[in-house]
Regions:
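Extreme N-terminal leader/targeting segments of oxidoreductases
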Residues: 1-19
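Flavin-dependent oxidoreductases
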Residues: 189-269
């Protein structure tokens, strides 16, 4: 981003701290909490407000697994890495559950359903189930639709849950032990003599020993390192008025994850997806909904939930996700500023991986623990081996 001379108030106040975290979504807030818990002074800079980005614009579904069905993850990453990704998401779910209970915020643990739209997807779900069983992952498959909506196969995953992501993050921001500056978009990051870092934002300048960028899709706007590594990708969602009847309680994920839905405690239906029908149009930072995708979502809703035919759609919104090149989060530090760290590129699964990834980054920043397969340098290695 750029900031004019007239808009720049960063020189009006300067703060010094041990660590500055950029981004007050679920990753940045939890990272700040972890680092502050180790006795370090922490400042969080947020461009808008807590959970303003993808964290507060998703479906609030805490799911295990990656963007792929499990057998596809095994084929793509190899069995060992696919299983490590699964374990990371399982650990992440445990973290979110514990914090939700600590905060007293919403935690609806009714499990999740992977739903097949047709026989081809049913075959893939069977393969996914077999691969999950091979790795002792708890799940169940059935070829009878428990929702009675015409889905042809269902993999049930116990323990997955739904949250209210904004209230969750607001509660964390109040208890994280760090100083938060909202409406403080960062427009410059520069090294200081002696090894520190200076971050200039709209409201304040922060000088610190280390910084961490937890801005996901917006990382390329902060540093060119991310331009070829993180792709801003828009997702769209709608929410109906309450139906008056609870039809199902699980978090639902179908059409290979391209549609996802849940029924909220007030019986309204939240539905997102349809992006794959308009891939090229759904890239970039523009916050808007489109008639094509919203129409597709409404058609899906009426096909599978005709009870919603007379319900008014109360909310339509979009959110910008940060897609990594390989679908795995990117963690590391900037080549030109090694004390500026980052955790970005969650590929639509920030609630599934974000907190556990922040935990890995905190251990790396404070104790030098190896990032292993989360290390963003893997992309350079992949590029060097590409013919």
């Amino acid at each position: 981003m750029t900031v004019s001379y007239w808009q720049d108030a960063s020189g009006d106040r300067t703060i010094e701290c041990d660590v500055c975290v950029v981004g007050a979504g679920v990753v940045g807030l939890y990272l700040a909490r972890l680092i502050a818990g180790q006795g370090r002074s922490v400042v969080v800079l947020e461009a808008r407000h807590v959970a303003a980005g993808a964290t507060g614009r998703n479906a609030g579904m805490v799911l295990t697994g990656s963007a792929y069905y499990y057998h596809q993850a095994v084929a793509t990453y190899g069995r060992e890495l696919a299983h490590q990704l699964w374990r990371l998401s399982l650990h992440n779910r445990d973290i979110v559950k514990g914090l939700s209970q600590e905060f007293g915020t919403l935690w609806i643990e009714n499990g999740s359903l992977l739903l097949a739209l047709d026989d081809t997807e049913a075959e893939d779900l069977t393969r996914a189930y077999d691969a999950m069983c091979d790795d002792d992952i708890q799940c169940k498959i059935t070829y009878k639709d428990p929702l009675k909506r015409g889905f042809t196969a269902v993999v049930e995953q116990p323990g997955d849950a739904g949250i209210h992501p904004v209230k969750f993050c607001e509660a964390m921001s109040r208890s994280m032990g760090a100083q938060l500056f909202e409406q403080s978009e960062v427009h410059a990051i520069e090294p200081l003599p002696g090894g520190g870092v200076e971050l200039r934002s709209r409201r304040v300048t922060v000088r610190c020993g280390m910084a961490a960028l937890c801005t996901n899709a917006y990382a390329p706007l902060l540093h060119p390192y991310f331009e070829s590594k993180v792709v801003p990708t828009r997702g769209q969602v709608l929410r109906t008025e309450p139906l008056g009847t609870m039809l199902f309680g699980q978090m639902c994920y179908c059409d290979y994850g391209y549609e996802y839905f849940r029924q909220l405690p007030d019986t309204s239906i939240l539905l997102g997806g349809w992006r794959h029908h308009f891939r090229e149009a759904e890239v970039g930072y523009e916050d808007r909904v489109t008639a094509d995708i919203q129409g597709g979502l409404e058609g899906f809703l009426l096909k599978y939930f005709p009870e919603a035919a007379n319900l008014r759609v109360t909310h339509r919104w979009s959110g910008t996700m940060g897609f990594s090149m390989d679908g795995i989060p990117l963690v590391g530090s900037l080549p030109d500023m090694p004390n500026v760290y980052f955790a970005v590129g969650f590929t639509g699964h920030g609630l599934g991986f974000g907190l556990a990834t922040a935990e890995r980054l905190a251990a790396h920043m404070l104790f030098g623990r190896d990032l292993e397969w989360l290390d963003a340098h893997r992309l350079e290695a992949q590029q060097s081996t590409t013919p």
